């Protein structure tokens, strides 16, 4: 019906190309327009002004001879004031953009090692965008944004990279574990040293108390029982301690202590050895 009355509708964010007898005449903005077909006017086609996206996958090789697939995402749109150029100058817009992307990526990536490609992907995207902007502006197109969205190495290389990463993490974990064990051993040794020191203090105080008690016992017994000597008192004390020791050993069900020599006569020998040691020490001085 619109063609019958020579009226055409152009949608929003779209322009129409008007021709007369096959020659470009005008760009029709969104709205209703009169196109008198009987005077040779017609619509050659429509051109969208919306932002479009094209994903380009490019296979190339890095400087260290690793094959990678670089995926670039190109966002572009036709310029309203250059709609006639965008419509007539390019027959395959996506193919043209793809060709420029291939050219820039395959010129940039081979100069970089694989790790540098990942680190400098923004610089690669900027180079692609600058080259596309310079080339496509002559055809009535604007490059809105260019992104390197993915860098995919060869499967074998990817597996090797994962193994290297895993090995590095295991090495760090092993170092941390060894450091923790080292600290634990140091703390354990410090604890044992402190324990032995305190135990030594306790034993020293215990022996001092025993000596003080024996001295008081000998002096008290000698005073209260006339005619007894210090030797007699010491023999009695040693016998008493002997029986106390044997009692404690027998009372413990799981005792691993063995009292040698175990006979009562051994107390006399012990006492004699102590006296001989004291006499020898006195003579030495």
Curated annotation (Swiss-Prot):
Keywords for this protein: Coiled coil, Lipoprotein, Myristate
Stretches that traverse the bilayer: none
Pfam families: Band_7 (PF01145)
Function: Positive regulator of hypersensitive response (HR)-like cell death. May be involved in potassium ion channel regulation.
Name of protein: Hypersensitive-induced reaction 1 protein
Lipidation (N-myristoyl glycine): 2
Description of what induces expression: Up-regulated by pathogens during an incompatible interaction, but not upon infection by a virulent pathogen. Up-regulated by salicylic acid, abscisic acid, ethylene and methyl jasmonate.
């Amino acid at each position: 019906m619109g063609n019958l009355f020579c009226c055409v509708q152009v949608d929003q964010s779209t322009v129409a190309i008007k021709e007369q007898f096959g020659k470009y005449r005008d760009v029709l903005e969104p709205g209703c327009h009169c196109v008198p077909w009987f005077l040779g006017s017609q619509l050659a086609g429509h051109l969208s002004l919306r932002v479009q996206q094209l994903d380009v996958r490019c296979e190339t090789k890095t400087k260290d001879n690793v094959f990678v697939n670089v995926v670039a995402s190109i966002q572009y749109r036709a310029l309203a004031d250059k709609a006639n150029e965008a419509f007539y100058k390019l027959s395959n817009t996506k193919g043209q953009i793809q060709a420029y992307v291939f050219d820039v990526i395959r010129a940039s990536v081979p100069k970089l090692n694989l790790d540098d490609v990942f680190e400098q992907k923004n610089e690669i995207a900027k180079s692609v965008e600058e080259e596309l902007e310079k080339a496509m502006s002559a055809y009535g197109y604007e490059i809105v944004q260019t992104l390197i969205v993915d860098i995919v190495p060869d499967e074998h290389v990817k597996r090797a990279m994962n193994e290297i990463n895993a090995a590095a993490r295991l090495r760090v974990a092993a170092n941390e574990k060894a450091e923790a064990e080292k600290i634990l051993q140091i703390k354990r040794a410090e604890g044992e040293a402190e324990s032995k020191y305190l135990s030594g203090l306790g034993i020293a105080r215990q022996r001092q108390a025993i000596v003080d008690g024996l001295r008081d016992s000998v002096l008290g017994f000698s005073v209260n029982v006339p005619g007894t000597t210090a030797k007699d008192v010491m023999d009695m004390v040693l016998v008493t301690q002997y029986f106390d020791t044997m009692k404690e050993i027998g009372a413990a069900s799981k005792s691993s202590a063995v009292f040698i020599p175990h006979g009562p006569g051994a107390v006399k020998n012990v006492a004699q050895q102590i006296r001989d040691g004291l006499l020898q020490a006195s003579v030495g001085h």
